[in-house]
């Protein structure tokens, strides 16, 4: 007998008119049930020709693109000088005693973090800064460059100096100093690594390159650096086959040379390539000339001595003849000293071979929907999550609602800590740098996009004409406004640059995993140090709980001092005291249980207010509606099953038409939300088990068994056995050996 909606409803409400459960419940396994219930609910025929609705309230669906809003007054970010202490394990052991194996393993994962993708695709520098705001190209370019420069100054990025060297600011780690060690003997190295392959050759195997961070960088291969200057070696012709390791004598003279060429006043416009910190840098063929094409002749294979030297693009405007009212020399003449063409880092290290390319584009967006005054950098390293070579990121546990409630539902007083720039605490090994490159090709290449009459630089036609091609009202006005903000840095930011990540970036799937491991290990240490309190974390959200407010304040002081001693930066302005109701992960958790936060309840009410009936809604919009309603489903009487018709339409990528009955049913469900209570520990006395053809129960000394009319999928059979046990015994705790039943997420079975 088919199961009608009325019978289905009676069954849900355990009505007296319903037949015995053993006969009624197996009918729920009938595949046709959804269709019949849909018919009874007047959901109507889904295959109708009415055009689909692609927007419901704030939810947008297919074929809709949100136009990003550029804010020319975004506040530039400021990052503290974050340096997580390398001896973090030792410091934790001083604080709490010996660490557990689990804690040690997690902390070793991030000291340093390693990233070795199977395959890396390199993109041209023009794709470094994405043209995300076509109307504000120049403004966005400088804002992004400033953001990247700020990250480099804060020690988050390396700057590529040449194919095998990089500079950075901040305190070095030991694995970076190992690379930096210089003049001592090579006694640790095998002979295979001692003799370097010549400039321009690619004899090193792929394996050696990828393991450079672990193997060849551990010896004393890079040169020792004296007084922050990078010693300069004469460029070798590729056919000379001379190994890398030969140092010129007289490092003092070289240091002097470097510092001279670093000041880029117009009086000494000696610039050879994109990284003009050194006038004759090693391996130039792959480091610089690809960056500023107009500065070098086509025959770039010639030796350095033959190569003509051109002044820097920005300073060339100074004494040249004006071509119009918008000639850039009017801006360049505003300042006598435009500062250096490139800034130098405090430390230099040797890195694996890094091409003059990027592996991901960057752009700026609002920090979050509620904070449009500040900007956030978006880094697109999605190449590592796509295609045949995609990296399968490690999975990690996310606490579910019930376990959160069991753990945090108590009479404790709560506060939450905010870790500032949490991702940028965790250091990356330099061997990962060639895979995580961002940067830009310089302003001159960007200008080419702006003016339609500009040509890509042709050296036969002289440089001056090309300069005039750059002049346009749009560029002139933009630079004049930006001059007020950035001053002399306009010159610095107009040069090309390539930067690699020194700390874990946000755009890689590995980063959330590493951050979760790190904060959970730290909280584990804090819990053992203060056994009478509770510390819990999810990503960068750390909460502390204690019996009284006074107790909580002293705990807060002790934990803050401990975290600061490890080098973890907290944002004191964002520390929140919650009293006895903790706001965490979208829930409000108190001694009574958990409920969704008010802003989510408000969103649900708004969603129902704007939900149309008798109109086919695009499945993408349905997906967003289900995302919102699914979050609050555990707090409703019916739970997830109420959303099953929506799930089915999303899976089949069909439009869904809400009937007034179904909308009213959902409204009623979500109008009254019930708290999810903490599970009290108790004794289990009722057990259920099943096979595809039969079921069995044990209740104390009583046993029951039965068979199904037809063989069922095992998870369905186990679930039915658990339902029989609950209806027969009324017990709150059931024993089952099936993980699907235990998970209690019945929206889809394996």
UniProtKB/Swiss-Prot annotation:
Q: Which PROSITE patterns match?
A: RT_POL
Question: Region annotation RnaseH domain (RH): residue ranges?
Answer: 680-750
Q: Where does Mg(2+) bind?
A: 418, 540-541
User: Residues annotated as region Terminal protein domain (TP)?
Assistant: 1-177
- Taxonomy, superkingdom: Viruses
Note, other: Hepadnaviral virions contain probably just one P protein molecule per particle.
Q: What is this protein called?
A: Protein P
């Amino acid at each position: 007998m088919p199961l009608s909606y009325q019978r289905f409803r009676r069954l849900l409400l355990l009505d007296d008119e319903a037949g015995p459960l053993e006969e009624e419940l197996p009918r729920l396994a009938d595949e046709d049930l959804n269709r019949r219930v849909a018919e009874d609910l007047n959901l109507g025929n889904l295959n109708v020709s009415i055009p689909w609705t692609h927007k419901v309230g704030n939810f947008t669906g297919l074929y809709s693109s949100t136009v990003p809003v550029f804010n020319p007054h975004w506040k530039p970010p400021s990052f503290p000088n974050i340096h997580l202490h390398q001896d973090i394990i030792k410091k934790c052991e001083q604080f709490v005693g010996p660490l557990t194996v689990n804690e040690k393993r997690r902390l070793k994962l991030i000291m340093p973090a390693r990233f070795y993708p199977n395959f890396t695709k390199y993109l041209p520098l023009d794709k470094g800064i994405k043209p995300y705001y076509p109307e504000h190209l120049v403004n966005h370019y400088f804002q992004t460059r400033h953001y990247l420069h700020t990250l480099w100054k804060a020690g988050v990025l390396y700057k590529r100096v040449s194919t095998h060297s990089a500079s950075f600011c901040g305190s070095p780690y030991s694995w970076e100093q190992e690379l930096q060690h210089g003049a001592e003997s090579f006694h640790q190295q095998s002979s295979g690594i001692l003799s370097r392959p010549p400039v321009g050759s690619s004899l090193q195997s792929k394996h050696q390159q990828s393991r450079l961070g672990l193997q060849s960088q551990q010896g004393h291969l890079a040169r020792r650096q004296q007084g922050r200057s990078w010693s300069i070696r004469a460029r070798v012709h590729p056919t000379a086959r001379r190994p890398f390791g030969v140092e010129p004598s007289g490092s003092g003279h070289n240091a002097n040379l470097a510092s001279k060429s670093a000041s880029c006043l117009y009086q000494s416009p000696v610039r050879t390539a994109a990284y003009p910190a050194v006038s004759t840098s090693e391996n130039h063929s792959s480091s610089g000339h690809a960056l500023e094409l107009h500065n070098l002749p086509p025959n770039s294979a010639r030796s350095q001595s033959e190569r003509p030297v051109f002044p820097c693009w920005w300073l060339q405007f100074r004494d040249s003849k004006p071509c119009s009212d918008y000639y850039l020399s009017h801006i360049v003449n505003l300042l006598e000293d435009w500062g250096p063409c490139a800034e130098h880092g405090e430390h230099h290290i040797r890195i694996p071979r890094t091409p003059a390319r990027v592996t991901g584009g960057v752009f700026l967006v609002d920090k979050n929907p509620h904070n449009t005054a500040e900007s956030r950098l978006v880094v697109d390293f999605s190449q590592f999550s796509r295609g045949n070579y995609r990296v399968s990121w490690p999975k990690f546990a996310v606490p579910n609602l019930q376990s959160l409630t069991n753990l945090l539902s108590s009479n404790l007083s709560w506060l939450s800590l905010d870790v500032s720039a949490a991702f940028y605490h965790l250091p990356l090994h330099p061997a990962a740098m060639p895979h995580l490159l961002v940067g830009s090709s310089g302003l001159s290449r960007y200008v080419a996009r702006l003016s339609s009459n500009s040509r890509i630089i042709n050296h036969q036609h002289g440089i001056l004409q090309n300069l005039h091609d750059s002049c346009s009202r749009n560029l002139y006005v933009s630079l004049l406004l930006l001059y007020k903000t950035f001053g002399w840095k306009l010159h610095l930011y107009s040069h090309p640059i390539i930067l690699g990540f020194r700390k874990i970036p946000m755009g890689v799937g590995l980063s959330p995993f590493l951050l979760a491991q790190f904060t959970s290990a730290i909280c584990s240490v804090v819990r053992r140090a203060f056994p009478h309190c509770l510390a819990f974390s999810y990503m960068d959200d750390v909460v502390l709980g204690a019996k009284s407010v006074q107790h909580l304040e002293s705990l807060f002081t002790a934990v803050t001092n401990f975290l600061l001693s490890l080098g973890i930066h907290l944002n004191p302005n964002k520390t929140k005291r919650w009293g006895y109701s903790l706001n965490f992960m979208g829930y409000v958790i108190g001694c009574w249980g958990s409920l969704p936060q008010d802003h989510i309840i408000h969103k649900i009410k708004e969603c129902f207010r704007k939900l149309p009936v008798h109109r086919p809604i695009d499945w993408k919009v349905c997906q967003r509606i289900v995302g919102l309603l699914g979050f609050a489903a555990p707090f409703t009487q019916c739970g997830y099953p109420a959303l099953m018709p929506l799930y089915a339409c999303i899976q089949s990528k069909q439009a869904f038409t809400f009937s007034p009955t179904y909308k009213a049913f959902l409204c009623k469900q979500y109008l009254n939300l019930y708290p999810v209570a903490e599970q009290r520990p108790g004794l289990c006395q009722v057990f259920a088990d099943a096979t595809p053809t039969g079921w069995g129960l044990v209740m104390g000394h009583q046993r029951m068994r039965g068979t199904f009319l037809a063989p069922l999928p095992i998870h369905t059979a186990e679930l039915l056995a658990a339902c029989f046990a609950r209806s027969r015994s009324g017990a709150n705790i059931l024993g089952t050996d099936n993980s699907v039943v235990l998970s209690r997420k019945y929206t889809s079975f394996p």
